[in-house]
Amino acid sequence: MLVDKRIYLASQSPRRRELLKQIGIAYDVLPLRAVSGRMDVLEVAHAGEAAPDFARRMATEKAACGWRAVDLRRLLRFPVLGADTVVELDGDILGKPADRAAAKAMLARLSRSEHRVHTAVAVQHESRVDVRLSSSRVKFGALDDALIARYLETGEYLGKAGAYGIQGRAGAFVEYLEGSYSGVMGLPLYETAALLREFGLAV
């Protein structure tokens, strides 16, 4: 058992850090880029890859990349957690916008639309890897050009799938949400806690 031990978080997301703290998980952030050059995961969907499968694959690859970093840096061998969030609209995957124009286009598409948010969380320890998925339905109200422009000025869209963060000002865009609020934020707490317990952590 790894009771009261730490994990490594293979993510720079402040939201995921906050959520792990919320459920009492001790962690160290694992900066993948600092290990033997760039170790980033290429976040590109395969042709025909469904959004939930893409999220699972990305989370698994991030955890695996983190585990390689543990090996290379000869770190204490705690489990590595990776996660990935994707927004799906009409079968299209909306990832992190490349720039402000891309963010504006995404938000315009999400206006008055129901979309799905898929967040996968994966844990690797030695050769063992497991993954869980949370999928939620989110409906936005009407977003006119002025409202989108004001939101873009906040910069909240940066680094966020679908160009919004539900825990920030975009929370006012949500007409309804069916599923996991923490999953839409970026780390589904129910699935995360269940997965960490399977790896022997006290949650």
From Swiss-Prot:
UniProt xrefs under CDD domains: Maf
Pfam families: Maf
GO terms, molecular function: dTTP diphosphatase activity; UTP diphosphatase activity
Reaction catalyzed: dTTP + H2O = dTMP + diphosphate + H(+); UTP + H2O = UMP + diphosphate + H(+)
GO-annotated cellular components: cytoplasm
Cofactor: a divalent metal cation
GO BP annotations listed: nucleotide metabolic process
Protein EC: 3.6.1.9
Family annotation (SUPFAM superfamilies): ITPase-like
Top-tier EC class: hydrolase
InterPro entries with a match to the protein in the record: ITPase-like_fam, Maf-like
Catalytic residues (positions): D84 (proton acceptor)
Top-level division of the source organism's lineage: Bacteria
Key word Hydrolase present: yes
Site (Important for substrate specificity): R15, T85, Q167
Keyword set, alphabetical order: Cytoplasm, Hydrolase, Nucleotide metabolism
Keyword Cytoplasm: yes
Subcellular localization, as worded in the UniProt entry: Cytoplasm
Family: Belongs to the Maf family. YhdE subfamily.
Reported function: Nucleoside triphosphate pyrophosphatase that hydrolyzes dTTP and UTP. May have a dual role in cell division arrest and in preventing the incorporation of modified nucleotides into cellular nucleic acids.
Protein name from the UniProt record: dTTP/UTP pyrophosphatase
